[in-house]
Amino acid sequence: MPATKGKATKRRVKRATKKSGAGATKKINFIPNDPRAVNGPPMRAVAPRPNRTGTVAKFAFQAAPARAGLFEPGTPEFLYWQSREAALAAVEAFEAAAGPLRAWSSFAAQPLPLEPDAGRDLNAYYSRDSVSFFHSVLAGGPTFSGASTDCVAHEVGHAILDALRPDFWTSSLTEHAAFHEAFGDCVAMLTAFNDAETRTAVLAISPNLSKANFLESILEDLAHGVRLVDGVVDGSKPRRSLNKLRWQLPTTLPAELAPGHNPDELTGEVHSFARVFTGCFYDVVRNIFTSRGTLTPAGLLTASRIAGALLAEGARNAVENPRLYEAVGVAMLAADLGMNRGANQLAIVAAFANHGIALAHPARAFQPRARLAGGVAKPKRGAAALSARAVSAELRRRLGATTGTMRVDDFTLGADAASKFVHERSVSLDGLGAALEGVVAPAPEPVVVSRASATAAVALSPIPDSHTTEDEVRYFAMTLLRNGQIGEQQSPRGAARAGGEMLLSAISRGRRGAQGGTTAMPTHVVTSRGAERVLTRVRFACGCSRVAPRTK
């Protein structure tokens, strides 16, 4: 956390200790938002949340001190209790809206380790092996990403979405990766909305949430550090959820912020593009809140939980096509019809429209588009009534897909049963740079299918165009390359593990990377899979700095 707040922090610690008296060891100091949140609630003494028990997703907290206590910011003991409390608060807020989170992704560690300070880096990460936070020594003093509840909740949000939709992990589409980042920011906001003192403070600033405030501003402390280290780049300003950004086709955007440009501008870098969806979600909360007419802290809690539940269902049920923001929005509308009898349809539609995304009614979003072979003459009751083999063969022919897996998932359309066929296309990255010659990257091509007759099926969603898939994947890989997020495989000796793969040394040297250095912990690596070299995700990063971290 910033050294500039040291004196005020010490005064608050002393007052908290005096009030706690004999019970001081049973409480901890906790920053409920970000250390640099302007007008946010101050650090306070709280009783630490208990460990999660039962059949739920759990953490394995690393480097635990002997006991709880009112430790000062900047100490290892404070960082442990702060990051622990923030992580538990994030899951608690999500579950209050969306119900119990029974486990992390089946590909992730159970329990999931949380590292309060994993070394020196201006960043934070979720890999399927851990959520990890770091420290960095800046001109104004040390900063700790684990000291920010915003940052911890964001990374926990990645883990939550990975539990809901593990298939997003392997996708090489910009909007899929950007939605992952947006979901993390949404969980950070849900965590803030779930805190009573925070709700009171934000409504004192903006009674209807229409004015800029600390809650919709994400990662102030890390953004400050990025600006000191990297100058004016993507990530050098806090991400604002109250924004006027409008959706644009990602492949038409610059891959990174041009020198001298304002970080508020939209680029195809995933953290930048994520702000379009966080803007939609914040506006959903705001619209539900104002439409219900109870502009109180209690009313805000209700509105945020309604929006959080819709977001969770939207993420679970969205069709993973390249336009994922729209797909999640349509799935949120469908969830609202089922959960709330459509009470929030206008709030959702208006929120997405405000950011350039037009949502169709769920009943109109899935209409017959193409006849396919694959009906079943005598279907079993309640089944989708499809011949998976026949439909798969037909779709492969139409997709021009001679290779790649074809996954079949159940898909519900109201009271009707359907199936979702998902082909994984491997896209060549030749021509993007020497580091990616001979490398391929995977992307999903989904089609929703239902039975039309005894001999035919019908596609209810557009049949993907392979050229569009290739264009989107190559653009995403290019943004990773430009932003220094691709690594090459090392030998196992000395390498750490992440996401089931060996960590790899950074090799991508984009224009800015050549000037400012590249993170030694990239989000993607090139791995060998049989005879193929495949672009593989190993982690989600906070996206804060391109400067390589030093050792502990």
What are these regions (language model features)?
Residues 76-80, 84-149, 161-476, 481-501, ...:
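Zinc-dependent metallohydrolase catalytic domains
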Residues 1-76:
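Non-catalytic architectural context of zinc metalloproteases
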Residues 152:
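N-terminal phosphate-binding loop and flanking beta/alpha elements of the actin-like ATPase fold
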Residues 155:
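Walker B catalytic acidic pair
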